[in-house]
């Protein structure tokens, strides 16, 4: 994959490599976000040892490991001799790294933990007894394993990391760089269908339009992303069936635990356990109104899919796989996806507006946001609320994807709703509409 716009992450890696003390850097994030590409670019400039951990037996993994060391360190003897076990191999690696000042990178470290039980304990002992400078990067896509076996309080390596880097999807602004000659609408559609995953965007950008890309890549039994969500979920979970049903319910618009349980068929008594697991995997988000004083204990929490591609897949592909496998992806596109476009894109546009306010808030509303969220109660919902708690200023924002928007009508309704929120009594209030319509209203922000 092409290295693209991970400047801050690369800077952090380079800075940690210049530290005088030993460094253990943990890098994690879901599949296809460019972690390996980032680390390979870092490795190039540092002449680092890079080991891509295989899914295999301990003995086979050791053979791969020894071969990799022989090539990286230009030691022909390593190709002939065999280490008795992982303890000896890792001891040699540590000694060579310290002598030559070579950073060590273990990509997909969870696979090594699964293939070689106790390898994390070996690394821990070697780390603890060494007081010389060494740089180790442990990277993984299996978020549950990274959190439990590397970062968890019962993990052998707990408390030893110097840095934690969570690699996140690109924002709309950054992922749009993959589509430099496209219209705003097409960029938004691509973001809505493929999210901020650079590997998806790189492939999608090779097609002429967003609709062509989803038809070829997703709504096609042989498409490169047709089975992608199954890999994501099955790789980490033992009972994927219930989780698939929950993800489908979320993609269909169910947001509250009781709604999700009823729609998915998962017992109400167990739904929170499933939701917590999906949240730890960073597949879903738990959101509360911006005004909540104790978010963790809030009873107003909503759950939403954290990934646009998963939202598309579980909304359109999961319930219609039989249609796709009959070769009727084009019909699915014309009869279900396109007619549903404005409904599907509403939350996507809201997400884009949120990111735009976070990035360019001062330019758009005149001051720097300190906090951005949503508001809802039993009576009203407001798409975006922007706070400056220091100056007690607040901006209420409605986001409208449609091209024809009666801005004055939306603003009047927004002002009435904002007056009902008592949390901002005495604050300076502003109301805005963000849309793709063009108007001279000073409280309208054009995005398009």
Language model region names:
Residues 1-330, 334-335:
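Phosphate-binding site recognition
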Residues 297-448:
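A cross-kingdom feature that marks ATP-driven nucleic-acid transaction machinery
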């Amino acid at each position: 994959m092409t290295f693209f716009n991970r400047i801050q992450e690369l800077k952090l890696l380079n800075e940690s490599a210049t530290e005088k003390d030993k460094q253990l850097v943990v890098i994690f994030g879901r599949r296809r976000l460019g972690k390996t590409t980032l680390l390979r670019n870092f490795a190039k400039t540092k002449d680092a040892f890079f080991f891509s951990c295989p899914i295999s037996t301990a003995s086979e993994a050791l053979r791969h490991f020894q071969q990799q060391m022989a090539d990286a360190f230009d030691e022909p003897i390593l190709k002939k001799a065999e280490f008795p076990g992982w303890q000896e191999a890792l001891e040699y690696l540590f000694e060579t790294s310290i002598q030559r000042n070579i950073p060590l990178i273990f990509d997909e470290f969870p696979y090594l933990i699964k293939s070689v039980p106790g390898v994390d304990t070996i690394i821990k002992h070697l780390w603890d007894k060494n007081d010389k400078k060494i740089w180790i990067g442990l990277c993984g896509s299996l978020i549950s394993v990274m959190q439990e076996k590397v970062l968890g309080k019962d993990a052998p390596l707990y408390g030893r990391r110097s840095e934690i880097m969570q690699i996140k999807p690109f924002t709309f602004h950054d992922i749009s760089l993959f589509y430099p000659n496209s219209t705003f609408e097409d960029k938004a559609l691509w973001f809505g269908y493929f999210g901020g995953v650079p590997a998806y965007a790189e492939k999608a950008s090779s097609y002429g339009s967003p609709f062509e890309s989803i038809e070829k890549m997703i709504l096609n039994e042989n498409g490169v992303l047709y089975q992608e969500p199954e890999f994501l979920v099955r790789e980490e979970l033992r009972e994927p069936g219930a989780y698939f049903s929950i993800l489908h319910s979320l993609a269909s618009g169910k947001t509250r635990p009781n709604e999700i349980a009823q729609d998915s068929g998962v017992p109400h008594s167990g739904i929170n356990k499933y939701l917590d697991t999906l949240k730890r995997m960073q597949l879903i988000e738990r959101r509360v109104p911006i005004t909540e004083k104790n978010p963790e204990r809030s009873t107003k929490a909503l759950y939403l899919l954290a990934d646009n591609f998963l939202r598309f897949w579980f909304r359109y592909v999961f319930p219609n796989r039989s249609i796709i496998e009959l070769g009727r992806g084009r019909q699915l596109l014309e009869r279900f996806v396109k007619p549903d476009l404005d409904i599907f894109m509403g939350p996507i546009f809201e997400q884009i507006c949120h990111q735009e306010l976070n990035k360019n808030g001062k330019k758009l509303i005149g001051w720097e946001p300190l906090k951005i969220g949503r508001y809802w109660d039993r009576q009203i919902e407001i798409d975006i609320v922007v706070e400056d708690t220091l100056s007690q200023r607040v901006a209420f924002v409605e986001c409208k994807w449609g091209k024809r928007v009666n801005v004055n009508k939306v603003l009047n309704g927004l002002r009435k709703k904002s007056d009902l929120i008592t949390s901002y009594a005495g604050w300076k209030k502003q109301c805005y509409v963000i849309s793709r319509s063009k108007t001279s209203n000073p409280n309208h922000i054009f995005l398009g």
